[in-house]
Amino acid sequence: MTRVEETAINLTVQWLQNNGYESADDYLQTGGNLVQLAEDLYHKETQGDLQSVWGDRKRRDGFAGSLYLAAEAI
């Protein structure tokens, strides 16, 4: 996992906590998309593009899994 991905995960977990979500599932039940949220938060914070670190779908899916696990551990 790259530093960019770690930063995006940390920003997302922090946002979920600050907005009253107790887990990733709480957010997903609202119809939210964790990866899209991570992309948006990362861009807002750094003006960077999270998608630029993903060379293929497998890499993006790995990020999505790591993000979900981190958000479940809130």
Name each region found by the language model.
Residues 3-49, 59, 63-71:
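Amphipathic alpha-helical segments in structured regions that serve as interaction surfaces
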